[in-house]
Amino acid sequence: MLHFSGSLTRLVGELKKLPGVGEKSAQRLAFHLLKHPSNIEALAQSLLQVGERVHLCSVCFAITEDDPCWICSGERDSGTICVVEEPQDLLALERSRAFSGRYHVLQGALSPLNGVTPKDLRIAELMQRLQGGEVREVLIATNFTVEGEATALYLTRLIKPLSIKVTRLAHGIPVGSDLEYVDAATVQRAVEGRSEL
């Protein structure tokens, strides 16, 4: 940022570190904050509070201010654990209201090319949770990417010997979409995963 103050240049530099925020977007955000100075203090306070108060649940590794989180300390079905990659995935499932069990957040997915191994994820903690005998089913809800599929396969191989039912989220054609616009792999999975009516 040529000819701007050092403070503004630093702000733009910090904003650019956020995912999906490039130079232009960072400048736009910085100038918006300058136009509305009352927002600066509120934003700064929110950022500080998140840094001080928000942490990972010691049971499921979701983001929380309380430990254990409200899901782990609530009246949810403790016999079913849904494994997700990131806390955002847990929120998506909760919005659907389709799952009433508990969660386990891996904090990522296996990615040998990026140096992410099982030791980098919360897999050991998941396996420890499964030792108690209370869990009947593990629903693997990793993303349908190469990394997510590899993680699902790896987890299945670890969990199956424990005589715990392992299921995977169904995937197929999104509601409201036309078949002609759906990729071949999605159509294939939808056909293979068809159910009887």
UniProtKB/Swiss-Prot annotation:
This protein's record includes keyword DNA damage: yes
Xref: PROSITE patterns: RECR, TOPRIM
Zinc finger C4-type: from-to: 57-72
GO BP field: DNA recombination; DNA repair
Keywords from the named record: DNA damage, DNA recombination, DNA repair, Metal-binding, Zinc, Zinc-finger
Domain Toprim per the UniProt entry, residue ranges: 79-174
Gene3D superfamilies recorded: 3.30.60.80, 3.40.1360.10, 6.10.250.240, RecR Domain 1
Signal peptide (UniProt feature, chain positions): none
Molecular function GO terms recorded: DNA binding; zinc ion binding
PANTHER family: RECOMBINATION PROTEIN RECR
Function field: May play a role in DNA repair. It seems to be involved in an RecBC-independent recombinational process of DNA repair. It may act with RecF and RecO.
Family listed: Belongs to the RecR family.
Name of the protein: Recombination protein RecR
